[in-house]
From Swiss-Prot:
Residue span, FAD-binding PCMH-type domain: 1-159
Gene name, Swiss-Prot/TrEMBL: ygfM
Organism phylogeny: Bacteria, Pseudomonadati, Pseudomonadota, Gammaproteobacteria, Enterobacterales
Pfam families tied to this protein: FAD_binding_5
Single GO MF annotation: oxidoreductase activity
Name of the protein: Uncharacterized protein YgfM
PROSITE patterns membership: FAD_PCMH
InterPro entries cross-referenced by the UniProt entry: CO_DH_flav_C, CO_DH_flav_C_dom_sf, Diverse_Substr_Oxidored, FAD-bd_PCMH, FAD-bd_PCMH-like_sf, FAD-bd_PCMH_sub2, Molybdo-cont_Rdtase_FAD-bd_su, Mopterin_DH_FAD-bd
Gene source species: Escherichia coli (strain K12)
Regions that span the bilayer: none
Length: 259
């Protein structure tokens, strides 16, 4: 239960508070995760990011830059946001939650269901932290230390990309979320959430340049999901393979229409 609430007005002050209280303190963005089961925090000190001026969207030489405190719904409403990212933002089913949650909080929460991560992985998003460090989102997920996330950068925001979520109902548990993207130089990206302990890319499958049934089978063989109330291992492998192959076909069609 949070007993102390600090509201610094600069990144430097926020970092100093974190250095002072270390593991006793938690970064507080929108609060949708820290105040709700199953991600409710047990930390007693909260460091609010509300006054750090991180709620913005900008362009820099063709790259899309998003402040970590940008709320999901206003971000989804922005007309210039890439279609796949807009689609993924809608996977957070409740408009109320989208108005509270921040994109940085969704990344940092590292929850079991992370419906935004596949599209960010497929778009090769980079993360900027309060100490000036920049990491690819894939590297961050491999070692998600307790850093202060300040910015998300997508250098190629309009690459051909498609994403989809499979769930039992709109508000129900997600079986799998997938995103597929095609790049100009080094082939496809395949990113998944829901079939492993964290979101991941299928690098080995990407290198094979497959499509159709061959792609379905390769994806199914590359993942090792656990059986639970969302489905059996066989079902999860099957539906994930079909989903990725369909998304790849969508990307191919979109690329042809753009020519």
């Amino acid at each position: 239960m949070i007993e102390q609430f600090f509201r610094p007005d600069s990144v430097e002050q926020a970092l100093e508070l974190k250095r002072r209280y270390q593991d006793e303190a938690v970064w507080f963005a929108g609060g949708s995760k820290l105040n709700a089961t199953p991600t409710r925090t047990d930390k007693k000190i909260a460091i609010s990011l509300q006054d750090l001026e991180l709620d913005w969207v900008d362009w820099d030489n063709g790259a899309l830059r998003i402040g970590a405190m940008s709320r999901l719904q206003p971000l989804r409403d922005a007309r210039f946001i890439p279609a796949a990212l807009r689609e993924a933002l809608g996977f957070v089913y409740s408009r109320h939650v989208r108005n509270q949650s921040t994109i940085g909080g969704e990344i940092a929460a590292r929850q079991e269901e992370s419906v935004l991560l596949p599209v960010l992985l497929a778009l090769d998003a980079e993360l900027v932290f309060g100490n000036g460090e920049t990491l690819s989102i894939e590297d961050y997920l491999a070692c998600p230390c307790d850093r202060l996330l300040t910015e998300i950068i997508i250098k190629d925001p309009y690459r051909t990309c498609a994403t989809r979520k499979i769930s039992r109902s709109q508000a129900g548990l997600t079986v799998v979320t997938a995103a597929v993207a095609m790049t100009d130089h080094d082939g496809m990206r395949i990113a998944l959430d829901g079939v492993a302990s964290k979101a991941l890319r299928l690098h080995d499958v990407e290198k094979q340049n497959l499509e159709g049934n061959a792609l379905e089978q390769a994806v199914a063989n590359a993942i090792f999901p656990q059986e639970d109330l969302r489905g059996s291992v066989a079902y999860k492998r099957y539906i994930t393979g079909v989903l990725v192959a369909d998304l790849y076909a969508d990307c191919q069609q979109a690329g042809e229409e753009a020519v």
